[in-house]
């Protein structure tokens, strides 16, 4: 699925990240994204060749642009064939993320809880952006941090006083667990 996503994204003004188990490949980067990328291991590519990935599992892709409305318009223009096979979400007001259908944080929470023999009615999820929506809905208690996007606040049963940079997780632990 990496090739169709890559070809589609190449028609837009976005940096493209392709994630394999071995490496993150970044195409069409920009100064804002270069600054962020100093924090993660990656290989910056200066060509448009992704055929070397044909024997690799590309488990995630994302497009980056600082204009969220531009990314939303891009999603509207995405072919139905891609929409049908992808989970699409947004994060950090700069990314549109693509995972295979059924791969999302809600499914991950359910898998982890099952693996650890934790009943779902004992789970709490904390989120701030659209990529957390499935997890917020799946958990017994969905919590939005103070600076969460409106969609997350609407889906959550509780909103913290603190934001994601001000100990929101500690607030949740103190309020609901201890």
Question: Whereabouts are the PLM-identified features?
Answer:
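Short, small-residue-biased leader/transition segments that mark boundaries at the very start
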Residues: 1-3
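Conserved acidic, metal-coordinating active-site core of Asp-based
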Residues: 8, 12-126
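Mg2+-dependent phosphoryl-transfer enzymes with acidic/Ser/Thr/Gly-rich catalytic loops
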Residues: 97-178
């Amino acid at each position: 699925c990496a090739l169709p996503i890559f070809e589609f994204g190449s028609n837009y003004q976005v940096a493209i990240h392709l994630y394999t188990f071995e490496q993150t490949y970044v195409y069409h980067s920009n100064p804002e994204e270069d600054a962020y990328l100093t924090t993660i291991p990656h290989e910056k590519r200066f060509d448009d060749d992704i055929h070397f990935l044909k024997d690799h599992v590309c488990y995630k892709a994302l497009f980056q642009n600082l204009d969220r409305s531009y990314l939303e318009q891009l999603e509207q223009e995405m072919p139905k064939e891609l929409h049908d096979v992808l989970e699409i979400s947004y994060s950090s007001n700069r990314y549109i993320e693509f995972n295979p259908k059924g791969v999302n944080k809600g499914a991950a929470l359910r898998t982890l809880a099952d693996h650890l023999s934790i009943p779902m009615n004992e789970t709490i999820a904390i989120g701030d952006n659209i990529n957390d929506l499935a997890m917020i809905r799946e958990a017994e208690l969905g919590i939005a941090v103070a600076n969460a996007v409106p969609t997350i606040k609407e889906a959550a049963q509780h909103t913290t006083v603190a934001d994601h940079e001000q100990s929101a997780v500690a607030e949740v632990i103190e309020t609901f667990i201890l």
